Swiss-Prot record:
Its main location: membrane. The gene is clcB. GO terms for biological process: response to acidic pH. It is found in: Cell inner membrane. Keywords: Cell inner membrane, Cell membrane, Chloride, Chloride channel, Ion channel, Ion transport, Membrane, Transmembrane, Transmembrane helix, Transport, Voltage-gated channel. One of its GO terms (molecular function) is voltage-gated chloride channel activity. It holds the Pfam family Voltage_CLC. Belongs to the chloride channel (TC 2.A.49) family. ClcB subfamily. It comes from Escherichia coli (strain SMS-3-5 / SECEC). This is Voltage-gated ClC-type chloride channel ClcB. It is a multi-pass membrane protein. Probably acts as an electrical shunt for an outwardly-directed proton pump that is linked to amino acid decarboxylation, as part of the extreme acid resistance (XAR) response. It comes from the Bacteria. The chain crosses the membrane at residues 5-25, 54-74, 146-166, 168-188, 222-242, 258-278, 291-311, 316-336, 352-372, 380-400. One of its GO terms (cellular component) is plasma membrane.
Amino acid sequence: MFRRLLIATVVGILAAFAVAGFRHAMLLLEWLFLNNDSGSLVNAATNLSPWRRLLTPALGGLAAGLLLMGWQKFTQQRPHAPTDYMEALQTDGQFDYAASLVKSLASLLVVTSGSAIGREGAMILLAALAASCFAQRFTPRQEWKLWIACGAAAGMAAAYRAPLAGSLFIAEVLFGTMMLASLGPVIISAVVALLVSNLINHSDALLYSVQLSVTVQARDYALIISTGVLAGLCGPLLLTLMNACHRGFVSLKLAPPWQLALGGLIVGLLSLFTPAVWGNGYSTVQSFLTAPPLLMIIAGIFLCKLFAVLASSGSGAPGGVFTPTLFIGLAIGMLYGRSLGLWFPDGEEITLLLGLTGMATLLAATTHAPIMSTLMICEMTGEYQLLPGLLIACVIASVISRTLHRDSIYRQHTAKHS
């Protein structure tokens, strides 16, 4: 047991450095090509001329597509081993390391050029890769899946500063690939990754800064639960739209570079209306949480961002949709809150409360992981007073979504790439 805890600690350290490496590579490319040192792609887009704002995501998609197509031609065959940690956990616990690194580099290109796709997917993949590489060298074969799971959880903890949610991500989303009794090493890896990440970044701040002064009462619980019902209906719709967009891009029968370039061009066109569509949505979420906009502004940014996410994910841009889903949930919750705020004197607090609820419940509706989704929002914002209400709402959202749409976003992703 002591040996496993020691290895879990090493995996956590490796994962933290893998995440930090990807993050610093992003910052370097943004500084080189966008003259942006703020770390915010929305700020970068705001400072660009309209034509550069239009073309940059398309050029990034084109470069990523050329890289992926070039690698396919170089290998002359599909890789025998997976390039995704979920696939690796469902098979024999092995990666195609070279192909996975190429995929991560392609993700780096599309993320730093403004595509509306999550950077955290590549971070978690690199963390799992680092764990797998270490495991194959120093541990027996039957433990490889466990250490990949530890790496994925640690990567999630370092990326989102949410070690408990990262651990439960393994238990809920990847349930069946490992025993719950093995969660001890997973939790150790996640916590160590968070601590090392804090040391690297010289900060232990929460991912999102929220000033929620409301004390949750009976009325608020009713509003939270009703938001869960709304998210349970919206989750399957979002998954259906993503699947339809992917099929639409595939039906065009474009070569990968042109398909990714088209997705990037759509993002560029949308960014002419609002630069908030650039990136994974982190900075937009923070600005909404700091000062919730008016209803029409939320609606406009929401529609543009939704189309940008659909274009990016549908075109096959390598990256995650976890953080974009958080923004979509926030916007849905805030739109609902703004509508209800007309009837209550404390409309601003209701809007913020239901925005946070929307983040958790839409995440639960798309991942079918209510406990992880609840803890994720609490850990990212520090608003643990919301935990009881969010847990009920997330369970409701997950049940409704699972009834209407059998597959979660991760099962849908695996089926799409199998």
